[in-house]
């Protein structure tokens, strides 16, 4: 291995290991995240509005601050939040047995407090769940009591009281919240979120690969230490290929999607030469690398089932946003540090207006659906065809219509896609075979994911119901997929990447882009860059602040003496101005003050030697002047 690659990998791995920890942050990280006075953030309130669903349910920091407000101000509100948290934990519990039964018992105890006089008196003679009817509580308790004896308790038994608790919290408690310092602090975080982003926000590390318009490298946020992947789109290369609309489309779709199974966009900014997308860093490599370099011959069905389930969830989240992916293949499925997978590279994705079918020959040869190859109109079914190709390849170790590195013309591959029936070996179980056949049906109307579907975007439900995902198979080790837990990221992956490995080509093996000649950027391009350069993306940025403990460390409300911090006090601006007026002098102020003291001291020394300052001798004044000049000269030397 070349020395350049060893150094690049060592530095990158060291940064990766420190990512999110204090040693990964800049020494000046708190300066990057200084809160302004809350009055400067009032425009954020007008811009974002005040709906409960936005502030508490969609904004991670908003939810934490609302819960903090409830805990600090009202026991009833706090109990409501605790109830919601326990129900959410119950519904996504890792264990369908004893752990879930224990949680159900704890939730029942909370609901039973309506008849508990001791608890009632501790909350101003009103129990926390007084807004729930006796019928709702008794029905829920009865169902939960029976569930505590079930081997696998139902996950939805608390859905009705949960819904009613939400309705309660969004009324009076939330109205009180937006009048407090906790909401002002939320606005301060939103203000920080809106600040401009540039190249100085990040440290850059080794190149990981190439995109269509530039390099992809690892980067680290200076303020938080969190690691990301930086995808560069060279401005001149984008313009030369007339790809402005394509680039902006990818950025806007990434910004719109918030799914744990699709790479997230955290920042978008520009430099002099490039448009930059800062994305989720996936350290585990792509499925193509694992399939052909580490596991030639294919994966076992248990591993295939896990990857296929997470990919299905990722496509479901895209389809619910009316986004068609159109480029499913092994190299576009990336593994994270723990072995979970995400869909990447949304350059060919498109938003379907009113779910209307579209037309266009895009994709990768061998993975494009027959209707794309035949240049017909298509909809979400082409993505389910891609899932079929991917599952087949993961099991068989090769694509269904083309051998790896096979020398074959594009026309021949497209003929196979249109006409040939894929062949199945003994590697496929019966469930895997029927799943692939259903997904690889030539006619979209008969394809799995496109049949018996009320809405076109609901095809994932049909696939999730297939026996491959919902039945156990002792021969392959396959078990039913716990979809709720999988969506919460609580299912342990069957494979975990080595944290000390770099799943990327050597630095010197990644080809560099040639210089683009004959392209000049003008004012029209600047207008386009303004649409692209939008800075932080809200939810990923807030999650970053929480994960790296920046939120916990900065979210203080009181000084050591118990007084409110200046940026939350109504007179805080005046306080800060007064503080700055009497603050520690700057360098030059301290320097000249020191020299003045030296001059005064020299005069005092002369006085001690018997020099009459009332009637100075001819030598006294020159001595003082010489001392002053020496001080000035010394000052000039110090400044240089």
UniProtKB/Swiss-Prot annotation:
Residues 610-640 are annotated as: Disordered. Residues 479-544 form the AGC-kinase C-terminal domain. The active site is at 327 (proton acceptor). It catalyses: [G-protein-coupled receptor] + ATP = [G-protein-coupled receptor]-phosphate + ADP + H(+). Keywords: ATP-binding, Kinase, Nucleotide-binding, Phosphoprotein, Serine/threonine-protein kinase, Transferase. PROSITE patterns: AGC_KINASE_CTER, PROTEIN_KINASE_ATP, PROTEIN_KINASE_DOM, PROTEIN_KINASE_ST, RGS. One of its GO terms (cellular component) is cytoplasm. InterPro entries: AGC-kinase_C, GPCR_kinase, Kinase-like_dom_sf, Prot_kinase_dom, Protein_kinase_ATP_BS, RGS, RGS_sf, RGS_subdomain_2. Coiled coil: none annotated. GO terms for molecular function: ATP binding; G protein-coupled receptor kinase activity; protein kinase activity. Residues 1-201 are annotated as: N-terminal. ATP binds at residues 208-216, 231. It comes from the Eukaryota. Residues 619-640 have a biased composition (Low complexity). Its EC number is 2.7.11.16. Residues 52-187 form the RGS domain. GO terms for biological process: regulation of signal transduction; signal transduction. Belongs to the protein kinase superfamily. AGC Ser/Thr protein kinase family. GPRK subfamily. This is G protein-coupled receptor kinase 1. The lineage of its organism: Eukaryota, Metazoa, Ecdysozoa, Nematoda, Chromadorea. The gene is grk-1.
